[in-house]
Amino acid sequence: AGDIALESVNQSLVDAAVNQFGRLDIAVNNAGIAHQPAPVHQMTEDIIDRQFAVNVKGVMFGMKYQIPVMLAQKQGHIMNVSSLAGLGGAPKGAAYAAAKHAVAGVTRTAAVEYGRKNVRVNAICPFYSPTNILNVDGYNTPEAQAQLGMGSPMKRLADPQEIVNTMLLLLSPGNSYMNGQTIAVDGGVTAW
């Protein structure tokens, strides 16, 4: 599909969805990248720029084109994927954490701006799950992932399907009053 950090790619994705389905009831902004671990004083301009380009601009450009379609339909729901790092700190991951905090902020802002027009915007903040993002951090072995999982009260990583199930629950018609929320899917990490 292309580089999600580019506005034109986001516009093309929304146009393609509307052309194929005739409308856009739900949109999920789930592109994200991590960076090699480094403390704040070692962050480079390239690391910071790329984190914000993909993790923030990708979400904002997606919403820029999703929202007008939903406003014309008089309804819609946008689900942004932030991260547990977007609710707290991330040692040696400051650029990633800052970008994911920005996703939570734009989620809340858009929820306030468009809620009265029946366009809801929420975000989920998942704990680690065995996906490609762990390869960037060097946690691509079963042993390393098991160690990461020990950071959760459930003593394991999130299964990707558990994250999807949470999204489906939040996107369901019976959940139509939830708006502007960032929900942790973390096995209880934020309860500590």
Q: Predicted segment positions?
A:
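Short, small/polar-rich loop/turn modules that mediate ligand/substrate recognition or access, typified
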Residues: 115, 120, 178-180
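Amphipathic alpha-helical dimer-interface segment in Rossmann-like NAD(P)H-dependent oxidoreductases
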Residues: 54-72, 111-112, 116, 172
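Residue(s) in the substrate-gating loop at a strand-loop-helix junction
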Residues: 83
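Active-site helix of classical SDR
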Residues: 63, 99, 107
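A glycine/serine/threonine-rich, flexible loop-to-helix segment
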Residues: 116, 123, 128-152
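Catalytic Tyr-X3-Lys loop
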Residues: 41-60, 75, 79, 103, ...
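C-terminal substrate-recognition "lid" of short-chain dehydrogenase/reductases
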Residues: 60-63, 156-185, 190
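Conserved mid-core segment of classical short-chain dehydrogenase/reductases
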Residues: 34-49, 72, 92-95, 135-140
